[in-house]
Amino acid sequence: MSLLTEVETPTRNGWECRCSDSSDPLVIAASIIGILHLILWILDCLFFKCIYRRLKYGLKGGPSTEGVPESMREEYRQEQQNAVDVDDGHFVNIELE
């Protein structure tokens, strides 16, 4: 019987699963993966602003500055820092009607 068609049915002793081999390692592994997926999905919904802002500004290296004078490098760094400071905490919420 497929896992998708198995149903818990009420009996005299309470709720029981009609699946006789629920101790199968494949069923246990699928359950663990499902639970982990649910946890990660919830965390993503709660913290997506923090996660994606870190990925956008924290891990991305800027363009190569090889051959560029130091004064221009410093000006570029300052512009990038100002862009991060201005954007910090300001997100646009788009609501679809």
Swiss-Prot record:
The modification Phosphoserine is found at S64. Residues 58-80 are annotated as: Disordered. The record marks W41 as: Seems to be involved in pH gating. The chain crosses the membrane at residues 23-43. Residues 1-22 are virion surface. The M2 protein from most influenza A strains is inhibited by amantadine and rimantadine, resulting in viral uncoating incapacity. Emergence of amantadine-resistant variants is usually rapid. Keywords: Disulfide bond, Host cell membrane, Host membrane, Host-virus interaction, Hydrogen ion transport, Inhibition of host autophagy by virus, Ion channel, Ion transport, Lipoprotein, Membrane, Palmitate, Phosphoprotein, Signal-anchor, Transmembrane, Transmembrane helix, Transport, Viral ion channel, Virion. Its main location: virion. One of its GO terms (cellular component) is membrane. GO terms for molecular function: monoatomic ion channel activity; proton transmembrane transporter activity. A lipid is attached at C50 (S-palmitoyl cysteine). Forms a proton-selective ion channel that is necessary for the efficient release of the viral genome during virus entry. After attaching to the cell surface, the virion enters the cell by endocytosis. Acidification of the endosome triggers M2 ion channel activity. Belongs to the influenza viruses matrix protein M2 family. Cytoplasmic tail plays an important role in virion assembly and morphogenesis. This is Matrix protein 2. It comes from Influenza A virus (strain A/Chicken/Scotland/1959 H5N1).
